[in-house]
A protein has these predicted regions:
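Peripheral, non-AAA+ core regions of ATP-driven protein-machinery
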Residues: 1-27, 40-45, 70, 128-131, ...
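Short, surface-exposed charged micro-motifs
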Residues: 359
Length: 577
């Protein structure tokens, strides 16, 4: 347990400075360089002439990603006649047909129309569909088209499997002579995000049993010397392809890497999202007036995005500033702690962090710890799991011979929407220990982290948003120099805080404490150790044990014993009568 330096609040790229300085000398890199698994899937799919006939690619379904996938297909096209690799420009390039999201049976398969002339010699007219256009090539199909029109799939599956298309009349009520079935050699590529792929899997289990090959567009990359060069070449290719201004210097490249670490929520990874890069670089180009992009331009574009999306977060924080939502940032309270939450609003593009007051009260009872959120059906399953894990740790830590003679209730105060996740279980545990021991908690410190049954503190998501949410409350009321956040040590690699928070930490006006277990967290909040090997030391557990002892052997025990006897007598009287 120790206070973290401001230098750990953001990524450190000094070891890569030589590579950053030589950015301008790097060659643009193709997307396949950073997508080895997807490239291998496309290469093998192109080479196979029999099965599978379908390649599923998990990726955002938009034109930008489709264009890059088509680029990969063209790179690995094979000659179906001799099964040997063609050159980059094949003698006879295989067609690649893109089907839009609005695909009908007629558009996909074609149809047969009745003859215009009403005589027996007239032949019906045939309209070919996208499958015919993709003969001996590839059909790129959006997964949305299949899910929005499920009746397409059985016929499409049969056509791809058999290699034969059976014609159907455009009007089923009109009897016409259909042409003979046609042979088709088409490979289907389905593109869609992971959630839509899951829907398709549930409707067609064969897709996961070898009927289709699988590939995915990876969204991030582990940072090292080799991957950084490839990544910067990838960024350079995006800039060249979309005719954007180049970076002014290595500081601009570092600013991009910092923004990427924040986006990926990991100091050790680089994002590969095409849309994110294109949006950020386009807006940075706007800030630079079409000249070279500087670090200041990138930071300005990030601030502009934050400003556009700041209305809801600012309204939420304003409710705290005006006292409508009660959050303490100074003083001490028993059974109350500042937890940290991430709020996701439907229709809003980004999640934001805000503190939440978690309170716990105890009373005489049978040891039950009541989760109010769960009882009123505002708590999700993961939150309920976190509560039960926390209760198991408390029972183990107290090591009682009999049930705890107190019951407790824990609640997120002024929370009126669903709460889920286990990231508040450390805060809930601290509130419970405070209430049981009657030891107050320092309200200048907020807490986030999940706990396991052994008291170890585990990583949580949205760590940057959580820290910045509590900082906004503190800075509005005035920084005291003692405020800060307790977070899991395993979350340090996820930190990429904004410049204002980093400067406050650097000036010792705001603090970050990283903890590995409950024993490290509770002393920071209560100024007392959680437990000690020396039995004479006053600890949180010893205070709880004294309270339980007083209950069992003090005057309070006699009073409660008499009340229990009266309660039992009344119950027996009702049973007998």
């Amino acid at each position: 347990m120790h206070e973290e330096s401001w230098r750990t609040m953001f990524p450190d790229y000094t070891q890569y400075q030589t590579t950053l300085d030589h950015y301008s000398n790097l060659e643009p890199a193709s997307i396949g360089t950073l997508q080895p698994r997807l490239s291998d899937a496309v290469r093998r799919f192109s080479a196979l002439n029999l099965q599978p006939r379908i390649l599923r690619i998990t990726a955002p379904d938009n034109t930008l990603y489709r264009d890059y996938i088509i680029e990969l297909i063209k790179k690995y096209q094979f000659n179906s006649n001799n099964n040997t690799t063609c050159s980059q420009t094949s003698e006879k390039e295989q067609p690649i047909i893109i089907a839009g999201e609005n695909v009908t049976a007629e558009k996909l398969f074609g149809a047969v129309y009745p003859p215009l002339e009403q005589n027996t010699l007239a032949k019906p007219s045939v309209k070919h569909g996208l499958l015919h256009q993709a003969h001996n090539g590839y059909l790129i199909l959006s997964i949305t088209a299949l899910l929005s029109n499920p009746s397409l799939w059985p016929r499409l599956k049969r056509t791809l499997t058999d290699g034969v298309l059976e014609w159907e009349a455009s009007n089923k009520k009109v009897v016409i002579n259909l042409p003979p079935a046609e042979k088709l050699n088409v490979k289907l590529v389905i593109i869609g995000d992971r959630y839509l792929m899951a829907e398709l899997d549930s409707a067609e289990p064969d897709l996961s049993t070898g009927f289709a090959m699988y590939g995915e567009f990876e969204q991030d990359l582990l940072l090292n010397d080799a991957s950084l060069e490839d990544y910067l070449g990838y960024v350079k290719a995006i800039i060249d392809h979309h005719q954007l201004p180049q970076f002014a210097d290595s500081n601009a490249v570092t600013a991009l890497l910092n923004a990427g670490a924040r986006y990926a929520e990991d100091q050790t990874r680089l994002p590969l999202c095409l849309l994110w890069h294109l949006n950020l670089l386009s807006e940075a180009s706007l800030e630079s007036d079409g000249k070279v992009i500087t670090a200041a331009n990138i930071k300005a574009s990030l601030r502009a995005k934050e400003y556009r999306e700041s209305y809801l977060p600012e309204r939420a924080i304003a409710d705290i500033h005006h006292g409508q939502v009660l959050i303490a940032s100074d003083g001490k309270e028993i059974g109350q702690v500042n937890g940290l939450t991430v709020v996701e609003m439907p229709g809003h593009p980004t999640a934001y962090g805000e503190p939440a007051r978690i309170s716990c009260v105890v009373h005489f009872g049978d040891g039950d710890i009541s989760d109010v959120e769960r009882k009123v059906e505002l708590g999700g399953n993961i939150h309920a799991k976190g509560m039960m894990i926390m209760q198991a740790f408390v029972a183990t830590a107290l090591d009682l011979d009999q049930a705890l003679p107190y019951s407790a209730s824990i609640v997120f105060e002024q929370s009126y929407s669903e709460v889920d996740g286990d990231s508040a279980s450390l805060a809930e545990l601290c509130a419970l220990m405070s209430a049981l021991s009657s030891q107050p908690i320092n309200q200048q410190i907020a807490v986030t982290g999940a706990v396991d049954q052994f008291g170890r503190v585990q990583a949580v998501g949205g760590i940057n948003e959580k820290v910045e949410g509590f900082y906004k409350v503190c800075v509005h009321r005035g920084l005291t120099g003692n405020q800060g956040v307790i977070l899991p040590k395993t979350n340090l690699s996820n930190l990429c805080l904004n410049d204002e928070v980093i400067e406050a930490i650097k000036a010792k006006q705001f603090h970050i404490w990283a903890v590995e277990n409950v024993d490290e967290a509770i002393p920071l909040l209560t100024d007392k150790p959680f437990r000690s090997e020396n039995e004479e030391d006053e600890t949180i557990l010893s205070l709880i044990e004294e309270r339980i002892d007083y209950f069992h052997h003090g005057d309070l025990s006699n009073e409660v014993g008499i009340l229990n006897k009266i309660r039992i007598c009344i119950a027996n009287w009702f049973v007998q009568n």
